[in-house]
C-alpha cells in the first residue's frame, strides 16, 4: 500500500519562529548554491551528451554553500509523522553517511530525504543559475510590493540515484523572502521530495517532472486544486497555505537539452502569469540559458485574410447563442500558426500542433468570467487537450458535462475553470466557404447552473438550433479534409510519446466509461443534441448516388450561400453520460454535391431506407400513422410531448411515414402557396406514395366535361363518400366543400410567384349540413348526364385526398386552407401591382435589416413590393448593385425563411400582423452562387 506524505505539523511556538527567522534566508544574496562538477567539460567536449550521466555526482571536493544546508534543515521544522508511523518513517529515511540515497519503493517516484552532504555542481552553470535567480528575485520583489504576494523561487535538477534518474531541489539555488515562515517551511518540505525524470515514466512525475519531461511550462491559479497523484506536496501546500505556482523548463541554448526546472511558488491565487513567465525567460536569457518562448501580444491580430473575413459572422453566431441561452462565455480557437500567435508553450516542434483563441472573435457575456477568457488567451492548447483540443484532433464535436473533472494533463485550464465556476462546455469544429481549408472551433460554456443531464441535453439541442438560424457560410468539416489539408498532422504526436499516450488514452477511457462519477464523455452531437446536424443526416436519406433532394425537411435550407453542406455517412453510436443516461453520437460524415433540384425523393432507394431502419429506435417503430393522426390538431411540440419523444425525433418519425410537414402549423397560417398546400396533402398519405393535385385535375380534364357543362348536381350515397365536391364559382364563398376551378390548367405551378388559374380551399362544414349525418355527402354539379362508372372513376381519384383531409375538417372546424399565391377568389383578386400587400397592411411595419455587424431600421412603405424593399436595403448598407444578396425574414417559429418575391413579402406581413409584432427582422446574406429555384422558399416540417 502506497504511503502518503506525513500530515502537516502543529503550529510552532514563538521560540521556534524566532529561531527560523534567524536562519539568514532572506534577500537576493541569501541564495544557497552548489557546484555542478564536470558540466563545462560535458558541454564543451560532448555536444550530444547523455543527460542520464550528466547529473551523476562526481568525486569532487565538497561544495561550499552560502549557508550550511544541514544546519538550516535542523533549524526548520519539518512535518511530524503521524502516530504510529515514527519508527517506519525513520527506518525508511536514507542514511546521511551513505554514498547514495536509498529510495523507498513504497513512495513510487518521490521520497523524503535529508540534505546530502555532497552534491557535485558545475561552477559555471551554478553561477549562471544564481545570477538568474537574483534577477528573478529583484523583479519578484517589485511585484510583491504591488500586492502579488510573497514568493519562493527554487530550481529542480536531474540526478541519478541507483538506476533511476530523479529531480531534486536539495542543495540547489533558491530564493525566498525571509519574512515568510510558510514559504521557508515549504522550501524545507520540497527538499525532501524527488520526482521521476525518466521520459518512459507514466506516473509519479509531479509538477517538476511533467515540466521536465514534457518540456513545456505549467501553471495553476491554486495548487490546492491538484490531486495527490498530480501534486504529491498538496497536503503540505494546503497546510502552509500555498496557492499559485508556475514552473518552466531550463534549456541549454545550443543543444536544447533540458537542464532542469525553475519553480515559482506564491501565497496568493493568480490567474495571469504572463509577467512572471516573461520575467523568468528574460533572466535566463541574460545568463545564456533559455526557457520556453515568451508570449506574444495577447491581442494579436489575425493575419490571415480569410479568417478576418469570417470574424463578423462568427461574432454574430457567438452573440446570438450567448444572448439567447444566457451563456457566460463563447470563444473561437484556431491554430496558432494561422494567426502567427506565439506563446510560452511553443517550441519549434509543437508550434504547428498548438491552438489559441482569436480574441477578436470571443464573446464574454458574464463579466465575472473575463479572467478565465484572459487565461485561455494566454494558455494555448495542444491537440487532444480539453474539448477544444479533442475537437481539433478528432474532427468530432466534443462535449463535457464538467470540465473541472479533467486532470491537468487532460485539460491544462481545468483549475481556472474551477476557480471561475464553469462546468459544462461543448466544442464544434467548423469551416466556412470563405476560409478554404482553414478550420476553427467554437467553444461554448453552458450556464453555471446547468448541471443536470437532461437540462444539458436540452440546452445543446437549443444551441444547435440557434446556430443553424444564424450561420449562413458555415459547414461541418469532412474527416478526409482534416487529414489531407488541415493544419495538424495527426500521425505525429504533439507531445513526447509518454505524454501523448497519457492524454489520449485517458480521454478514450473517459469516452467509453460507463457510470464513472465525475468523468467526462466525448459526446458527439445527435438528433437530441444537435438538430441542425440531424437535419443534414436525414437529408441524405432522401437522395442516392450523390444526388440529394433539395427539398430538405424541417425547415433546413441547402443553398450554398447558407454554408451548411448536405452530409451523409454519419455513424451513430451510443455514449454513456456520467450518470448512465444514453446519448447518441456521430463519428464522421461525407459531403455530397447538390447536382439537381428535385421536388421529391426516389422511392426506390432501398439501400437508404435500410440504413435508416437500422438507426430507428424502439420508440420510433411503435408510433404508427394512426397514432400520429390523433395529434395532428395540435402543434408539433405538443404532439412530441404527448408521445414521449423530442420534437426532432417526432420529425423523423413523420418522414418515415411520408409526412414532410406537420399539418396544423400550416393550417393556422393564411396566405400560403398552393405548393405548400400540396405538401400538406402529400404528407398524410403514407410512405407508399402521395396524392398529387395535378393528377386530380387531370381526371377532371380527361372526361368529356367542360366548364360550361358542370352545372347540375349528381348525388352519391353517403356510404361511398362523406364530403361534397363541386366546382368553385369566383363570386361564391367555398364552405364545406373540396373544390376545384379549372380553366385549361392540368397541374399546379410549383413557384409561388407564378400565377395560376387554379385555387383550392377547404373550410369547416356548416352545422346545417352536419345535421344530416356525421359528414356531408359528395355532390358534383353538372348539366349533362353521365353514367355511374364515370362518376366512380372521378371519386376514386379524389378519395385518398378526401379520406385524409376529412380529419382536419372534423378536428379543426374553424381552420381554413388557402394558397399563398392564390387566395380564395371570393376574398381576393389576383395579385396586381401589390394591391394585396397594400390591403394586408393596416399600418406600416418597421424593417430591421441585419448585415454582418451592421444594423438599420426603417419603415416599410405601403406601396413597396419585394424588389423595392430589396433596393432600399442594398442602398442603406452601401452594397454594390452587382452583388447578389439573399433576404430572409424571421417567422413566428424563429426560423429564417427566404424572401424572394412579392408573395413571400405578403406572407411575411401576415405572419408579423398575426403575432402583433411591428418589427420585421430581415437577414441580408451575400450570395455565393445563384439559388436553385429560390421561389420554393423554406420547406419542410418545423
Swiss-Prot record:
Keywords: DNA-binding, Nucleus, Transcription, Transcription regulation. GO terms for molecular function: DNA binding; DNA-binding transcription factor activity. It comes from the Eukaryota. Residues 597-609, 765-774 have a biased composition (Polar residues). It is found in: Nucleus. InterPro entries: NLP, NLP1-9_GAF, PB1-like, PB1_dom, PB1_NLP, RWP-RK_dom. Residues 844-927 form the PB1 domain. Residues 1-32, 77-106, 594-620, 723-753, 759-778 are annotated as: Disordered. Residues 609-690 form the RWP-RK domain. Residues 21-32 have a biased composition (Gly residues). Its main location: nucleus. Probable transcription factor. This is Protein NLP1. It comes from Oryza sativa subsp. japonica (Rice). The lineage of its organism: Eukaryota, Viridiplantae, Streptophyta, Embryophyta, Tracheophyta.
Amino acid at each position: 500500500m502506497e504511503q502518503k506524505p506525513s500530515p502537516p505539523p502543529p503550529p510552532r511556538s514563538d521560540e521556534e519562529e524566532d529561531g527560523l527567522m534567524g536562519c539568514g534566508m532572506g534577500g537576493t544574496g541569501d541564495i544557497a548554491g552548489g557546484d555542478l562538477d564536470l558540466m563545462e567539460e560535458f558541454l564543451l567536449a560532448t555536444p550530444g551528451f547523455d543527460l542520464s550521466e550528466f547529473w551523476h555526482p562526481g568525486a569532487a571536493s565538497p561544495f561550499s554553500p552560502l549557508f550550511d544546508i544541514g544546519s538550516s534543515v535542523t533549524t526548520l521544522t519539518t512535518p511530524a509523522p503521524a502516530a504510529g508511523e515514527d519508527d517506519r518513517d525513520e527506518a525508511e529515511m536514507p542514511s546521511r553517511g551513505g554514498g547514495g540515497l536509498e529510495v523507498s519503493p513504497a513512495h513510487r517516484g518521490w521520497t523524503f530525504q535529508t540534505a546530502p552532504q555532497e552534491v557535485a555542481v558545475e561552477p559555471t552553470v551554478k553561477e549562471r543559475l544564481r545570477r538568474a535567480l537574483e534577477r528573478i528575485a529583484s523583479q519578484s520583489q517589485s511585484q510583491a510590493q504591488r500586492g502579488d504576494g510573497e514568493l519562493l523561487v527554487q530550481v529542480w535538477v536531474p540526478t541519478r540515484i541507483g538506476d533511476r534518474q530523479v529531480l531534486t531541489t536539495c542543495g540547489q539555488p533558491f530564493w525566498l523572502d525571509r519574512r515568510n515562515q510558510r514559504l521557508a517551511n515549504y522550501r524545507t518540505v520540497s527538499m525532501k521530495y524527488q520526482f521521476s525524470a525518466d521520459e518512459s515514466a507514466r506516473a509519479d512525475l509531479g509538477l517538476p517532472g511533467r515540466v521536465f519531461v514534457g518540456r513545456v511550462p505549467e501553471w495553476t491559479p491554486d495548487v490546492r486544486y491538484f490531486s495527490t497523484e498530480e501534486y504529491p506536496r498538496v497536503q503540505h501546500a494546503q497546510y502552509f497555505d500555498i496557492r499559485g505556482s508556475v514552473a518552466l523548463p531550463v534549456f541549454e541554448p545550443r543543444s536544447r537539452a533540458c537542464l532542469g526546472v525553475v519553480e515559482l511558488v506564491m501565497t496568493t491565487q493568480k490567474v495571469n502569469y504572463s509577467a512572471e513567465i516573461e520575467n523568468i525567460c528574460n533572466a535566463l536569457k541574460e545568463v545564456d540559458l533559455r526557457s520556453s518562448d515568451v508570449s506574444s501580444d495577447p491581442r494579436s491580430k489575425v493575419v490571415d485574410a480569410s479568417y478576418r473575413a469570417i470574424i463578423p459572422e462568427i461574432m454574430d453566431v457567438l452573440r446570438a447563442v450567448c444572448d439567447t441561452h444566457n451563456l457566460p462565455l463563447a470563444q473561437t480557437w484556431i491554430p496558432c500558426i494561422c494567426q502567427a500567435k506565439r506563446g510560452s508553450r511553443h517550441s519549434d516542434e509543437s508550434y504547428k500542433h498548438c491552438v489559441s483563441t482569436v480574441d477578436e472573435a470571443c464573446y464574454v457575456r458574464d463579466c465575472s468570467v473575463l479572467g478565465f477568457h484572459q487565461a485561455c488567451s494566454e494558455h494555448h492548447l495542444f491537440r487532444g487537450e480539453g474539448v477544444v483540443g479533442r475537437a481539433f484532433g478528432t474532427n468530432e464535436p466534443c462535449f463535457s458535462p464538467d470540465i473541472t473533472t479533467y486532470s491537468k494533463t487532460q485539460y491544462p485550464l481545468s483549475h481556472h475553470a474551477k476557480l471561475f465556476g464553469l462546468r459544462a462546455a461543448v466544442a464544434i469544429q467548423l469551416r466556412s466557404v470563405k476560409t478554404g481549408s482553414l478550420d476553427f472551433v467554437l467553444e461554448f460554456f453552458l450556464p453555471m447552473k446547468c448541471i443536470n443531464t437532461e437540462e444539458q441535453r436540452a440546452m445543446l439541442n437549443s444551441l444547435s438550433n440557434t446556430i443553424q438560424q444564424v450561420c449562413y457560410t458555415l459547414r461541418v468539416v469532412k474527416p478526409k479534409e482534416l487529414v489531407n489539408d488541415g493544419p495538424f498532422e495527426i500521425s505525429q504526436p504533439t507531445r513526447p510519446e509518454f505524454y501523448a499516450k497519457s492524454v489520449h488514452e485517458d480521454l478514450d477511457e473517459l469516452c467509453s466509461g460507463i457510470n464513472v462519477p465525475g468523468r467526462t464523455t466525448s459526446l458527439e452531437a445527435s438528433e437530441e443534441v444537435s438538430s441542425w446536424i440531424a437535419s443534414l443526416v436525414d437529408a441524405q436519406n432522401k437522395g442516392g448516388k450523390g444526388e440529394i433532394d433539395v427539398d430538405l425537411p424541417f425547415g433546413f435550407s441547402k443553398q450554398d450561400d447558407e454554408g451548411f453542406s448536405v452530409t451523409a455517412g454519419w455513424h451513430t453510436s451510443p455514449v454513456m453520460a456520467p450518470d448512465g443516461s444514453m446519448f447518441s453520437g456521430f463519428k464522421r460524415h461525407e459531403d455530397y454535391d447538390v447536382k439537381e433540384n428535385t421536388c421529391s425523393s426516389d422511392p426506390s432507394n432501398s439501400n437508404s431506407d435500410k440504413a435508416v431502419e437500422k438507426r430507428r429506435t424502439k420508440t420510433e417503430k411503435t408510433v404508427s400513422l394512426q397514432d400520429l393522426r390523433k395529434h395532428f390538431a395540435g402543434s408539433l411540440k405538443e404532439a412530441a410531448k404527448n408521445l414521449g419523444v423530442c420534437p426532432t425525433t417526432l420529425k423523423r418519425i413523420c418522414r418515415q411515414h411520408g409526412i414532410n410537414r406537420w399539418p396544423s402549423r400550416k393550417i393556422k397560417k393564411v396566405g400560403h402557396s398552393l405548393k405548400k398546400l400540396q405538401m400538406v396533402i402529400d404528407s398524410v398519405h403514407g410512405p407508399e406514395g402521395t396524392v398529387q393535385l395535378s393528377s386530380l385535375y387531370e381526371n377532371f380534364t380527361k372526361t368529356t366535361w367542360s366548364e360550361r357543362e358542370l352545372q347540375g348536381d349528381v348525388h352519391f350515397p353517403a356510404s361511398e363518400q362523406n364530403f361534397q365536391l363541386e366546382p368553385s364559382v369566383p363570386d361564391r364563398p367555398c364552405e364545406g366543400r373540396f373544390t376545384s376551378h379549372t380553366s385549361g390548367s392540368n397541374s399546379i405551378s410549383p413557384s409561388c410567384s407564378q400565377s395560376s388559374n387554379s385555387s383550392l380551399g377547404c373550410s369547416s362544414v356548416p352545422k346545417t349540413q352536419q345535421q344530416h349525418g356525421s359528414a356531408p355527402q359528395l355532390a358534383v354539379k353538372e348539366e349533362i348526364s353521365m353514367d355511374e362508372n364515370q362518376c366512380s372513376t372521378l371519386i376514386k381519384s379524389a378519395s385518398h385526398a378526401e379520406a385524409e383531409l376529412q380529419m382536419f375538417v372534423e378536428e379543426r372546424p374553424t381552420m381554413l386552407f388557402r394558397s399563398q399565391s392564390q387566395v380564395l377568389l371570393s376574398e381576393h383578386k389576383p395579385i396586381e401591382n401589390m394591391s394585396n400587400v397594400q390591403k394586408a397592411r393596416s399600418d406600416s411595419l418597421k424593417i430591421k435589416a441585419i448585415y454582418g455587424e451592421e444594423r438599420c431600421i426603417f419603415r416599410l412603405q405601403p406601396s413597396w413590393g419585394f424588389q423595392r424593399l430589396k433596393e432600399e436595403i442594398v442602398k442603406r448598407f452601401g452594397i454594390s448593385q452587382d452583388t447578389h444578396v439573399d433576404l430572409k425574414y424571421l417567422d413566428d417559429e424563429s426560423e429564417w425563411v427566404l424572401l424572394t418575391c412579392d408573395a413571400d413579402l405578403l406572407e411575411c406581413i401576415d405572419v408579423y400582423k398575426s403575432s402583433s409584432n411591428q418589427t420585421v427582422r430581415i437577414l441580408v446574406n451575400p450570395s455565393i452562387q445563384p439559388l436553385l429555384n429560390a421561389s420554393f422558399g423554406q420547406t419542410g416540417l418545423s
